[in-house]
């Protein structure tokens, strides 16, 4: 594997700076260092969020208060964390992930031979990322930045935004602007991209023939409202985003563009019980699409699309987490410039079972299935399943080893062909 010199230098520079800064003896990710807690305060196993971690995020990266019993008014947002001293080192965190993997791919050809097979094995530097986040003391403002020092041979800004949060801990509202994830980190646990596997659920991340996916980080604005009962036993939240959306090549529009229409995303969440929740999600937009690229029949049009999703999970006995979800996809589709528009439709389901043997030690299994069609082509079916184990090597939860096996069958509704990928992976994640 070829690793860019720039990426390695960036990683070494950040590590050196962080090591030279004065730190407490227990080096754990920034928020845990700041509050003197373990990673499990906000995570089941990092990066999967629990109810407390969800509320921490909704409060603008402020810790939910323990004393919210209803006997007196809940503290205002500006009153939270008043006893926590701001420290530069507690605003920064670094993540490093490396792995060893074996991969086998079988692709249908529609010809002779009917399929081709390739295999590979490698040691990998999966990711090196730098985070900066936290509230501005004595104000309602907070900030978040996520820079990929190295990922897939390049470095780039993944997220960067500012937030203003007002109200009280039990009834608050926020406004956010900048480059942010569309779906990742949003919703209750079954809807979040954050999970125990190396990659999010296929139901959430699949890319349709128009290049549309929920796995994007566009520039836009975000607003929302959150209500919580005493001790945060129940949480109700609404969020609304307006973003630039996607360019013709499927990349995020980060600056000026001739695409003047905006995409909208709406999410409603309800948390209940020890750590259960349900989420309803709607995403609507449009994008420029280059059809039949590189041929004499190439043309450009602007299809509209929408996604509707429902998700839920419940944690039994603080041990067994059962998750499920459904996403319906609907896109315009043009075979040529003269025929009436056709439609791309897809129905996908996901199910997952996570069993926590003890804090930081979990077994997991999941299944995704779906069907998609572009008339008049026949319906094609895709599926993905995986199983694995995740174990924290420290009591603090910041060094994790994980082993997983995933098998995924992708079906192309345009070519009516598919491919199957089988991946075994052991990865090591260090968070500081």
Show the residue positions of the predicted features.
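The canonical Cys-X-X-Cys-His
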Residues: 36-47
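Detector for outer-membrane/organellar transmembrane beta-barrel domains
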Residues: 233-235, 259-374
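Outer membrane beta-barrel
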Residues: 50-51, 87-245, 260-262, 268-280, ...
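Gram-negative outer-membrane beta-barrel proteins
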Residues: 100-110, 151-155, 183-187, 229-231, ...
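Residues that define the transmembrane beta-barrel architecture of outer-membrane proteins
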Residues: 119-128, 154-158, 215-219, 260-264, ...
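Outer-membrane beta-barrel architecture
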Residues: 129-131, 161-163, 222-224, 267-269, ...
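Outer-membrane beta-barrel "beta-signal"
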Residues: 38, 389-393, 398, 419-432
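Outer membrane beta-barrel transmembrane domains
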Residues: 348-408
């Amino acid at each position: 594997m070829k690793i860019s010199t720039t990426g390695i230098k960036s990683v070494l520079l950040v590590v050196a700076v962080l090591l030279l800064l004065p730190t407490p003896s227990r080096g754990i990710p920034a928020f845990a260092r700041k509050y003197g807690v373990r990673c499990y305060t906000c995570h089941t196993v990092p990066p999967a969020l629990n109810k407390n971690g969800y509320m921490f995020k909704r409060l603008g990266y402020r810790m939910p208060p323990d004393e919210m019993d209803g006997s007196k008014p809940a503290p205002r947002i500006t009153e939270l964390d008043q006893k926590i001293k701001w420290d530069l080192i507690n605003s920064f965190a670094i993540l490093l992930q490396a792995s060893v993997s074996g991969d086998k791919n079988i692709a249908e050809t529609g010809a002779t031979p009917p399929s081709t097979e390739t295999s590979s094995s490698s040691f990998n530097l999966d990711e090196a990322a730098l985070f900066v986040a936290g509230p501005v003391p004595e104000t309602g403002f907070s900030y978040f930045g996520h820079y990929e020092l190295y990922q897939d041979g390049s470095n780039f800004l993944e997220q960067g935004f500012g937030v203003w949060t007002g109200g009280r801990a039990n009834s608050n509202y926020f406004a956010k602007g900048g480059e942010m994830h569309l779906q990742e980190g949003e919703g209750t646990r079954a809807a979040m991209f954050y999970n125990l596997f190396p990659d999010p659920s296929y139901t959430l991340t699949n890319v349709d023939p128009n290049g549309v996916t929920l796995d994007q980080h566009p520039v836009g604005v975000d607003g929302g409202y959150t209500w919580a009962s005493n001790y945060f036993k129940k949480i109700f939240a609404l969020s609304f985003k307006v973003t630039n959306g996607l360019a013709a090549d499927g990349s995020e529009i980060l600056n000026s563009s001739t695409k003047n229409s905006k995409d909208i995303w709406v999410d409603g969440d309800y948390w209940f019980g020890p750590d259960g929740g349900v989420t309803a999600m709607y995403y609507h937009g449009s994008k420029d699409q280059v059809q039949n690229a590189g041929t004499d029949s190439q043309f450009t049009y602007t299809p509209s699309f929408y996604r509707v999703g429902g998700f839920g999970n419940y944690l039994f006995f603080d041990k067994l987490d059962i998750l499920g979800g459904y996403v319906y996809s609907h896109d315009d589709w043009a075979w040529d410039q003269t025929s009436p528009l056709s439609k791309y439709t897809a129905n996908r389901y996901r199910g997952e079972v996570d069993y926590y043997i003890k804090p930081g030690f979990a077994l997991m299994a999941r299944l995704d299935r779906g069907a998609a069609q572009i008339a008049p082509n026949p319906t094609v079916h895709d599926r993905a399943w995986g199983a694995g184990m995740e174990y924290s090597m420290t009591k603090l939860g910041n060094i994790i080893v994980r082993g997983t096996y995933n098998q995924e069958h992708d079906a192309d509704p345009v070519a009516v062909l598919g491919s199957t990928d089988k991946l075994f992976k052991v990865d090591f994640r260090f968070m500081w």
